[in-house]
Amino acid sequence: MTIAIGKTQEKRGLFDVVDDWLRRDRFVFVGWSGLLLFPTAYLALGGWFTGTTFVTSWYTHGLATSYLEGCNFLTAAVSTPANSMGHSLLFLWGPEAQGDFTRWCQLGGLWTFVALHGSFALIGFMLRQFEIARSVKIRPYNAIAFSAPISVFVSVFLIYPLGQSGWFFAPSFGVAAIFRFILFFQGFHNWTLNPFHMMGVAGVLGAALLCAIHGATVENTLFEDGDGANTFRAFNPTQAEETYSMVTANRFWSQIFGVAFSNKRWLHFFMLFVPVTGLWMSAIGVVGLALNLRAYDFVSQEIRAAEDPEFETFYTKNILLNEGIRAWMAAQDQPHEKLVFPEEVLPRGNAL
């Protein structure tokens, strides 16, 4: 009789089986992060398409905001709940809608649905980048970079209205609706004169400049890209080896500016640092606005302009413009308040 001696196969638990299935190499990687990403992204996008197609904002804003009512892609939106709803999460089964889907849509329940599921979807996408980076053994800088737009989304759509009286003051999900919100930010918070906004603009525009310069420099310093006279005809996307000269690029920018990046790591870290830091600063600024912190105030100029009708600066002109925005938006944007302003409080002066 023959006796085989060997290790018995260990019994695999449910976690190991699920882990193998989730992290299997397939066309679309799922992963553990996919359990959060895919359902929430699907529901957020589905809620947005449903709202912009069918749901009116007549009951919350007195507006038409759906394709069904004649709006187009630029003017359709999923609008914020009514101001009377405060910070209620507006669950379909909650005391406001009481399980009535039509009533839930009328109250603005789709906005909280899209905002919360969208936030978790963005977080799931960042976790997906962490998970895949760990699987292929690279650094997680993509995920860290993606935290910047997440911080902006969360600060604008969630933290800002939490600091105000209700979800009503958050942006609605639509193109024209976002533009209205920008006007609101300027009129009520003087956002363009906020140093955190300035850092955000510098980050975004600086990143665009760096991206354009970097792409042009790489194209300019190609030394091996095929036999054709035209770069685009000669470029071979399957070519494995590097085809541009960092030394030549360094020499070029040293002649242009007198300084240049000495290595690729510092160059690309700088391209990462500029936009990400700018967006983080913008998010911090919006958190400040949630607490109604003010931007720069040049009170001495305002006092002098009030005393001397001939004295005016671009700052005092902008202050008058902000007063005009507030006077218009308070009545137009919050009709439920039934605000009526006497002529004495409306802005006047040669700025308008």
UniProtKB/Swiss-Prot annotation:
<dbReference type="InterPro" id="IPR000484">
    <property type="entry name" value="Photo_RC_L/M"/>
</dbReference>
<feature type="binding site" description="axial binding residue">
    <location>
        <position position="117"/>
    </location>
    <ligand>
        <name>chlorophyll a ChlzD2</name>
    </ligand>
</feature>
<keyword id="KW-0148">Chlorophyll</keyword>
<keyword id="KW-0604">Photosystem II</keyword>
<dbReference type="GO" id="GO:0009772">
    <property type="term" value="P:photosynthetic electron transport in photosystem II"/>
</dbReference>
<feature type="binding site">
    <location>
        <position position="214"/>
    </location>
    <ligand>
        <name>a plastoquinone</name>
    </ligand>
</feature>
<dbReference type="InterPro" id="IPR005868">
    <property type="entry name" value="PSII_PsbD/D2"/>
</dbReference>
<feature type="binding site">
    <location>
        <position position="142"/>
    </location>
    <ligand>
        <name>pheophytin a</name>
    </ligand>
</feature>
<comment type="similarity">
    <text>Belongs to the reaction center PufL/M/PsbA/D family.</text>
</comment>
<feature type="binding site">
    <location>
        <position position="268"/>
    </location>
    <ligand>
        <name>Fe cation</name>
    </ligand>
</feature>
<dbReference type="InterPro" id="IPR036854">
    <property type="entry name" value="Photo_II_D1/D2_sf"/>
</dbReference>
<feature type="transmembrane region" description="Helical">
    <location>
        <begin position="152"/>
        <end position="165"/>
    </location>
</feature>
<keyword id="KW-0602">Photosynthesis</keyword>
<keyword id="KW-0934">Plastid</keyword>
<keyword id="KW-0460">Magnesium</keyword>
<keyword id="KW-1133">Transmembrane helix</keyword>
<feature type="transmembrane region" description="Helical">
    <location>
        <begin position="40"/>
        <end position="60"/>
    </location>
</feature>
<keyword id="KW-0560">Oxidoreductase</keyword>
<keyword id="KW-0479">Metal-binding</keyword>
<feature type="binding site">
    <location>
        <position position="129"/>
    </location>
    <ligand>
        <name>pheophytin a</name>
    </ligand>
</feature>
<dbReference type="GO" id="GO:0009523">
    <property type="term" value="C:photosystem II"/>
</dbReference>
<keyword id="KW-0249">Electron transport</keyword>
<keyword id="KW-0472">Membrane</keyword>
<feature type="modified residue" description="Phosphothreonine">
    <location>
        <position position="2"/>
    </location>
</feature>
<feature type="modified residue" description="N-acetylthreonine">
    <location>
        <position position="2"/>
    </location>
</feature>
<feature type="transmembrane region" description="Helical">
    <location>
        <begin position="124"/>
        <end position="140"/>
    </location>
</feature>
<keyword id="KW-0157">Chromophore</keyword>
<dbReference type="Pfam" id="PF00124">
    <property type="entry name" value="Photo_RC"/>
</dbReference>
<feature type="binding site">
    <location>
        <position position="261"/>
    </location>
    <ligand>
        <name>a plastoquinone</name>
    </ligand>
</feature>
<feature type="transmembrane region" description="Helical">
    <location>
        <begin position="278"/>
        <end position="294"/>
    </location>
</feature>
<feature type="transmembrane region" description="Helical">
    <location>
        <begin position="207"/>
        <end position="227"/>
    </location>
</feature>
<keyword id="KW-0793">Thylakoid</keyword>
<protein>
    <recommendedName>
        <fullName>Photosystem II D2 protein</fullName>
        <ecNumber>1.10.3.9</ecNumber>
    </recommendedName>
</protein>
<keyword id="KW-0150">Chloroplast</keyword>
<dbReference type="GO" id="GO:0005506">
    <property type="term" value="F:iron ion binding"/>
</dbReference>
<keyword id="KW-0007">Acetylation</keyword>
<dbReference type="GO" id="GO:0016168">
    <property type="term" value="F:chlorophyll binding"/>
</dbReference>
<feature type="binding site" description="axial binding residue">
    <location>
        <position position="197"/>
    </location>
    <ligand>
        <name>chlorophyll a PD2</name>
    </ligand>
</feature>
<dbReference type="InterPro" id="IPR055266">
    <property type="entry name" value="D1/D2"/>
</dbReference>
<comment type="subunit">
    <text>PSII is composed of 1 copy each of membrane proteins PsbA, PsbB, PsbC, PsbD, PsbE, PsbF, PsbH, PsbI, PsbJ, PsbK, PsbL, PsbM, PsbT, PsbX, PsbY, PsbZ, Psb30/Ycf12, at least 3 peripheral proteins of the oxygen-evolving complex and a large number of cofactors. It forms dimeric complexes.</text>
</comment>
<dbReference type="InterPro" id="IPR055265">
    <property type="entry name" value="Photo_RC_L/M_CS"/>
</dbReference>
<feature type="binding site">
    <location>
        <position position="214"/>
    </location>
    <ligand>
        <name>Fe cation</name>
    </ligand>
</feature>
